[in-house]
Amino acid sequence: MKILLAIIGILLLSSCSSGSDWTAFVYPDIENIPSADQAHNYTIGNYSTFEECQAAAIERIRNNYATTGRQGDYQCGYKCSRRDDFGGLLICKETRK
C-alpha cells in the first residue's frame, strides 16, 4: 500500500512540474511581422515540447493560408515570460522554428 501511494505521489508531482514550457507564436502574414512589443498578441498556446509547439503552429499557418491565401510564419519560444526590466516585453530563453 505504501508503495502504491509513493508511486501515485511521484506521478502527481511529475505531472505538476512538467509544465507548458513552449509558447507558439503565429504571424498570419509573413510580409507584416509584428514588432516585439506586439508579439504577445500572436500566441496561440503553450505546449510541453518543442515538437508539439511546432506542429500546432504549422497547423495554424496551414489553416490560415487555406482561408486567407496569405503565407504566415511562426516561432516557438522556450520559457517565455514578461520582463519588467524590458518594458514588459515577452522574453523567451530560446526561440526555434
Regions found by a protein language model. Give the residues of each.
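Positively charged n-region of N-terminal signal peptides that target proteins for export
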Residues: M1-L4
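Hydrophobic helical h-region of N-terminal Sec-dependent signal peptides
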Residues: A6-I10
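C-terminal motif of bacterial Sec signal peptides marking the signal peptidase cleavage site
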Residues: L12-S15
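Bacterial signal peptide processing site
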Residues: S17-G19
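A short beta-strand micro-motif
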Residues: D21-N32
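A short, exposed loop/beta-hairpin motif centered on an aromatic-Gly-Thr core
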Residues: S35-A55
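Short, mixed-charge low-complexity intrinsically disordered segments
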Residues: R62-K97
